[in-house]
Design a protein with these regions (language model features):
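N-terminal intrinsically disordered, cationic/polar leader segments
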Residues: 1-27, 39-97
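Short, conserved glycine- and acidic-residue-centered signature motifs
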Residues: 30-34
């Protein structure tokens, strides 16, 4: 199961993603979608020159955190919307809180 958790505290946005979706061995489209969302968030924050406070992109263990700034909220909202859609479509494989 992939678990994605979003938090916003004291002007810092954080998205942590752990685990594997285990949708289909060898061609896991759910894991691929989750990876795409996290990597796109990281790339967007880089393009925004955001103040990134944590960046970890490892298989089964990712974290992206940034201080509030222009475009940062929107970038995290995009990623969170994607994870909510994944969780709705694949509830046995993705959990989003």
């Amino acid at each position: 199961m992939t678990r994605a958790r979003f938090t916003h505290r004291a002007g810092e946005y954080t998205l942590r993603v752990t685990g594997h979706a285990d949708f289909h061995s060898g061609s896991d489209i759910v894991c691929a979608a989750a990876s795409t969302l996290v990597c796109t968030l990281a790339a967007t924050l880089d393009a925004l020159d955001a103040d990134v406070t944590e960046l970890r992109l490892q298989p089964g263990d990712a974290a992206v955190a940034a201080l509030s700034g222009p475009g940062v909220r929107t970038a995290f909202l995009m990623a969170c919307t994607g994870f909510q859609q994944l969780a709705d479509a694949y509830p046995e494989n993705v959990q989003f809180t």
